Amino acid sequence: MAGRTAFIPGPLRAHPAWTAVAAAGAVAAVATAAVLTVSGAGRAGASHRGAHARLAASTCSGPTGAAYVSDSGWDGFSAIDTATCQVIQTYNVGDTQVPGDPGDYNYSSTNEGIAVSGGNLYFADTGTSNVAVIATSSLDPSNYNPPEQLINVGMFPQDVAVTPDGKQVWVAETGPQTSPSSPSGVSVISTASDKVTAHLPVGGQPSQVAFSPSGAIAYVVTADGLWLLRTATEKPVGVIHGLGDPHGIVVSPDGSTLYVTDTQAGTVAVINAATRAVTHTIRVGQLPWQMAISPNGQTLYVANPDSDSVSVIDTAANRVTHTVSITGDPDTLALTPNGQQLWIGQSTAAFVTVLDTATDTTVGSINLGGPTPQSGDGYEPTGIALVSTPTAGS
């Protein structure tokens, strides 16, 4: 399919406002922590076409909290202080120790999507067909190999998404295109036990999962179209076809509208969630991948890696109002809960750029600490999870 990559295979530094987090998708909050947003899987192995214009120094000033950025190049994730845009540490994920040699590891993992629930980070490890679970409370900047639990799922997991109530993680698995013994589908993980409770067959090569605000319906993007499943029964209730080469999905905050990217046509389909009909088609850039929607639902952001740009869409008018140039194959997006900052992962620049959405100016430029992917063992950001602690009175 066009635009897809087939894969064969102690606490953080003291910060009074960093705490555990809750469900994904900026829907739920637990205890004193709040999720800002969680992005899905980026594109591992994307081709490099340009250098990133780096800032001499970061001018970032964002919400107090942490960003966790998964990457498929170095096979780990970076923990970032969102208030300063400084990388605290970059950690390994899914790399198992070689028996008898405590200093050597099998570097076979390839991390894609990331999700957060109940103080745990969940990583889709495409290279090992596992979901890696790491407690944020266990992260220690002096140790880049944090303790983790590996949950075996279907082959080639691409995306992880947490239900609004935080009780389940749904895993989109592309699977081999021809293998009846390991079909593509969705694995459901209980966050209480961190065990797989179900495997749900859906259309071929599922790429992303999203939920209605109530959590009643799961939307799974596949090569065959958009599958709708009732989460209570884990049974399909419909499929929306005719979406071209779909990849990314977001749901409007009120649940009334679905947005799905078509990577081949360079468009976004606008779908009425009640009637399941496509009401508009919006042309954006080349290979539209991930999206993010503002908290009020009025603005949609679309990452176009093959155009080195982000399209900004007025959802009331269903049209692109302007385009922001971002070099380095931008394909991963995450918005802060107030919508004031857009975090953009650049898969071939080993950078995350932070935009002020009011002015579309760069307020932070974060070097993930390694070379670009083209120089070998480099960083390729594929997912961003932003978490923060509410301020007093919020």
Question: Can you say where each PLM-predicted feature lies in the sequence?
Answer:
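Predominantly soluble domains enriched in secretory-pathway, periplasmic, or organellar proteins
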Residues: 15-16, 29-394
